[in-house]
Every structure is written in structure tokens, then in C-alpha cells.
Amino acid sequence: MVDLSVSPDSLKPVSLTSSLVFLMHLLLLQPGEPSSEVKVLGPEYPILALVGEEVEFPCHLWPQLDAQQMEIRWFRSQTFNVVHLYQEQQELPGRQMPAFRNRTKLVKDDIAYGSVVLQLHSIIPSDKGTYGCRFHSDNFSGEALWELEVAGLGSDPHLSLEGFKEGGIQLRLRSSGWYPKPKVQWRDHQGQCLPPEFEAIVWDAQDLFSLETSVVVRAGALSNVSVSIQNLLLSQKKELVVQIADVFVPGASAWKSAFVATLPLLLVLAALALGVLRKQRRSREKLRKQAEKRQEKLTAELEKLQTELDWRRAEGQAEWRAAQKYAVDVTLDPASAHPSLEVSEDGKSVSSRGAPPGPAPGHPQRFSEQTCALSLERFSAGRHYWEVHVGRRSRWFLGACLAAVPRAGPARLSPAAGYWVLGLWNGCEYFVLAPHRVALTLRVPPRRLGVFLDYEAGELSFFNVSDGSHIFTFHDTFSGALCAYFRPRAHDGGEHPDPLTICPLPVRGTGVPEENDSDTWLQPYEPADPALDWW
């Protein structure tokens, strides 16, 4: 196997499409916002592609912006040299340069987020050069440029013994399919360079390099003789080593007699070696077919899983939209807030202010150790939905708890203690305690969180408002009135200590139980971890 890795300082290959999905939140530009704030981002480093293989050109807008109505043009060197054109929500192959027709494919699964990928197939040496992508609309135009480098590692070298010449043995090497022009080097057993007797490196019909070189090995250089072909762009080479004994050097007639005597044995050994090679080739072919069958099976399973994932994602978005019908107006209770927290005058946001300036007024509803606050509202029946803007905080807990939970001392945020909460730790670790820690993987980091309580069904669900996806649902039996729970964490380790803010929503319902509701919620599953310490 040949290692095709390249230093990031020079070239950096582009990964597959699945690794290029940008895990970021949805930021929409406001009407009239200056187009200069939008950037077109392409590959950061030059792209290295192998001859005959496929390469991907990713481009996206930052901040994210719906590009479905835009013109997106991939070009080479100049914008009029069209590689691929997307215009008026359709692709226009007739506008392509002849060299790129039937060789491109546009992947626009995330075009609504301003992210697209162009695949270029069957790479040839002439594809090398400068490329760019350009986004254009009535109020915005921008482009990004990058370089494409092309390399071919070439075929396995073929070495042959041509015979005796000028008192030595003549060796000849042939290979093809190299790009750019390779470097050939002969060396003796001591690593010293051997000058070639003949060397020719020429272009072939596919614009690749073919080479032929020979060397005459004399008695002083016999033993191990090696020849290497190096691709300087890839920093890779192919090398052959041949062993030649001194007895094969032309000389006395005794050598000729010995050679004639050993020739039948050499022929037998060659026949045996040929048989072994054929057997190995058949074995490799069998293994290749088995690998292809396994690959087909895995591909089918992957497609099935992707279909199921798409269905679940669509179902979660439908459940979120249904939950919004039960929006309620939630207000923070300042009397419950820990002394280190600051509740806004309108009761809609809470933030950490560090150590309290002095002793807080005593109140039986105030939390003494938990840096949290509850809502004024108490929910003991019906369905209720509210949303909280979490911004870029790296640590928080949100959800609901029993109104009667103890206000003094620490508490474990689990259903057994009367807490049903979702937590974020260190900016990327989302989890719940149910009752053990269950880690959650989110496709898009939420900047706004939706919480839906169905009291009679015993369900508390969380939604990522940034992409409308369902995150997690607690299933339990509630034994008393519940309050909305807010904990911004007093010692946030992030760079953006935004407050937790209750978002205004149009109140469409009163939270009255609804009959014949068969909504279902999806739950990610992970093995339970050992119990955690107090939070």
C-alpha cells in the first residue's frame, strides 16, 4: 500500500462529503444587511488529486445563508471558464467547458444553509490549475479561489535482464502512468549512485510520463542492485532490488559451463515461482470478490439507516411544531434565585454575577447552594411549552423540577430527586441524568432550546430550535406541581457568558389536556454510566 499523505504546509487533500458537513447553528441575515459581511469560503489549502480518481470542491457562505435562489458558478482561472453552473434552481450543463462535461456532480443537500460541494470525476493531468466558486444574487456577490494539484504514482516497475554487455550485465527498467515527471535512480549495494547507460522519460497519449532506463552492472557493483522511481510531488517512490552473484559476470569458460549446468534448475525454480504467483493471484481475486460483497451489504445497510434517520428527523420536527401550540408565558421568580444570580426586572432572563456582594435577604424559597432559579408558574396539569435562549454559554442546565424540592443543600439533578433537566458541560458535552448519565450527540449546537411538558402523559421533552430537531424525552410519573428550572452555572468556562433568556412566544393554547393524542417521541440510547457526583 502506498501512503499518499501530504504535508499541510504544501498540500492538503479534501475529505469525503460526509466529513464536510458543517456542524454550526443557523444564522439568517436580516433584510438590508450589508453584503460585505457575507463571505464565500472554499478549501483552505491546495487540493491534491490522483489521476483517475475523484476530487471534491466544497464551498459555503459564512454566516450561513439560503443559496437556493442564487447563481453558483465553479470556474477555472476566470469566471467565464465554466466548470459547473447552478442558476435559477437548476444545473446548466450546456454552459460547461467541453473538458468538464459529464465529469461533474453537484451535491446540494445543504444548499439551504449556503453549503454546496462539486465533485469532479476522472482526474487527468490537464485538470491542474486555479479553480474558484462564485455566489451571486441581486444584493450579494463573492467568490473563493484555490489550487488543484494533480499527481500520478505510476505502474509497478518492470525489471528485465537484457544480457551481457561491455563486461557486465545489462538491466532494463520500464514503467508508465507517472505525473509529474518522475526521478529515476540506480544504486549499488553500498548505496552509491550508478550512472544509467540509457534513460528516456516521455509523454504518452494520456499526458502522463512513461520511462525506460537501463544500466550495465559490472563486477565491482554486484550483489544488491536497486532502482527507484520517485514522485517528488507525493514524496513517494517505488523501488526494486535485484541480487546478482559474481559468478554471472562474463569470464572464463568454467563460468559458462557452470551456467549451462545450472540453467535447468533455474528454469524449474522459475516454473515453481510462476505457479506460486498464480495461486496467490487466484487467492487475491477470491478475497476481492468477498470484500465487494461485504461492501455491497454494508452500503445497503447504510442506506437503510440513513432513510430511518431522515424519517426520525422529520418526525421530530413535526412533534416540535405540534408542541408550539401549547406555548405559555413563563416568568422567573426572583425570590427563588441563588444570591450569585441576577434576575432581570421583567423576570425574563437570569445571569451569573459571581460572588454575591453581601448576605442575601432571607427567604424560604431561595436556593442556598444550587446556583439556580425557578419560574413563578406552577404546572400541575395540561401541556405547556416554552423556549430559552442559551446563546454561547458553555455550561447550563434547563428543564423542570418539582416545586417542592428542598432549597437548602446540594441536590443530584435526576428524576429520583425531582429534577428533569438537560445539561451542557465544557461547551460540547450534552447529557441527561436518567438516572445515570446519558451522553447526547447533537447535529447542530442549539442556541435556543424548546421545553415541552405533557403532565398527564408524564413526559418532558427538549427540542433544538436552531434546526427543529428532537433531543430527548423523559418518561416519568409526576407527583406534584412542576416549575421551569434555570441554572446558568456561576463559573462558566466559556468566552461568552450570555444570560439565559426566556423567549417571547405567541400564546396559542391554555395547556388543557387533549384527547386522542398519539404523539411519540424519539429517545437516543446509550449504556448507563456510573452514578455522578453532585452537580
Curated annotation (Swiss-Prot):
GO molecular function terms noted in the UniProt entry: signaling receptor binding
UniProt keyword terms in alphabetical order: Coiled coil, Disulfide bond, Glycoprotein, Immunoglobulin domain, Membrane, Signal, Transmembrane, Transmembrane helix
Membrane topology: Single-pass type I membrane protein
Glycosylated position list: 102, 139, 224
Domain Ig-like V-type span(s) in chain numbering: 54-135
Domain of life per record: Eukaryota
InterPro entries: B30.2/SPRY (IPR001870), B30.2/SPRY_sf (IPR043136), BTN3A2-like_Ig-C (IPR053896), Butyrophylin_SPRY (IPR003879), ConA-like_dom_sf (IPR013320), Ig-like_dom (IPR007110), Ig-like_dom_sf (IPR036179), Ig-like_fold (IPR013783)
Family: Belongs to the immunoglobulin superfamily. BTN/MOG family.
Protein's name according to its UniProt entry: Butyrophilin-like protein 9
Source organism (scientific name): Homo sapiens (Human)
UniProt lineage: Eukaryota, Metazoa, Chordata, Craniata, Vertebrata
